[in-house]
């Protein structure tokens, strides 16, 4: 089986052009950075998710984007009672958890998304200034692989996902794509269509030479015999969080 990951195309003259997603997708919105709320709103309009689930503090992003989730999950340490009442009055269900729990709010929201049996889950606001939270959310990608559901982290600038088989990236020439071995060694790695190609390579933790590669012609092929690769793909060539976008 071959997986295809499509990048969002950014054109200065006409804004963002994106493919219409035909698979069943569920959005999970967490409380980290996601960039311009308009990007989330546009993606909700084009991807037509089957449901939007909020992890506690992610409600502020949804409020800014004008989106009402079907469900809010968490310990409510970032969502005051007034906002909880606001969402409940609009038909949103809230599942409240104690603060003393083993799961993060984002993980709880992801589990609710899995119950809907989607083909894909897009987790918004999963990255940001809290490195520990970002690492926790990256680790959640493994649960998607275990269930056969494609899970990715996404914001205005990039998406992050795991690769465990031949994968075709459809995007735009010049897009930065970084690849890292995840949870051990990745063997038999072959990259085609990238500025820096590889043939039957072994990638190991502690040797991050897969950082800052680039798509050459808008299409790259990633193959591996064993292990997992963590992919980080930036949508706009040369544009990264915290940098000017003129």
Can you name each region flagged by the protein language model?
Residues 94-116:
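Short phosphate-binding loop-to-helix
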Residues 132-142:
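Short Gly/Thr/Asp-enriched flexible loops that form oxyanion-binding sites at enzyme active sites
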Residues 9-21:
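Short, Lys/Arg-enriched N-terminal segments with co-localized hydrophobic residues
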Residues 158, 163-246:
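Long, charged alpha-helical interface segments
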Residues 1-9:
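Hydrophobic alpha-helical signal peptides and transmembrane signal-/tail-anchor segments
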Residues 22-87:
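N-terminal beta-strand-loop-alpha-helix module at the start
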Residues 29, 53-56, 74, 95-96, ...:
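General beta-strand structural signal in soluble alpha/beta enzymes
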Residues 143-159:
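Short, acidic/small-residue loops that bind anionic groups at enzyme active sites
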């Amino acid at each position: 089986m071959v997986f295809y990951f499509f990048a969002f195309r950014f054109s200065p003259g006409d804004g963002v052009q994106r493919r219409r997603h035909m698979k069943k997708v569920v959005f999970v919105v967490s409380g980290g950075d996601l960039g311009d709320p308009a990007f989330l709103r546009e993606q909700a309009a084009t991807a037509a998710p089957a449901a939007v689930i909020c992890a506690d503090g992610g409600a502020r992003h949804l409020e800014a984007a004008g989106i009402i989730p079907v469900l809010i999950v968490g310990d409510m340490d970032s969502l005051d009672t007034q906002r909880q009442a606001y969402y409940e009055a609009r038909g949103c269900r809230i599942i409240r958890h104690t603060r003393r729990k083993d799961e993060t709010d984002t993980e709880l929201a992801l589990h609710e998304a899995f119950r809907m049996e989607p083909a894909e889950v897009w987790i918004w606001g999963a990255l940001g200034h809290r490195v520990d939270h970002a690492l926790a959310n990256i680790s959640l990608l493994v649960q998607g692989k275990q269930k056969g559901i494609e899970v990715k982290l996404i914001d205005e600038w990039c998406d992050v996902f795991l690769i465990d088989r031949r994968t075709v990236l459809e995007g735009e020439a010049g897009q930065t794509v970084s690849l890292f071995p995840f949870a051990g060694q990745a063997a038999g790695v072959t990259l085609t269509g990238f500025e820096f190609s590889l043939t039957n390579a072994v990638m190991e933790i502690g040797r991050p030479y897969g950082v800052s590669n680039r798509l050459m012609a808008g299409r790259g092929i990633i193959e591996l015999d064993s292990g997992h690769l963590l992919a980080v793909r930036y949508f706009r060539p040369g544009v990264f969080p915290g940098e000017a976008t003129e």
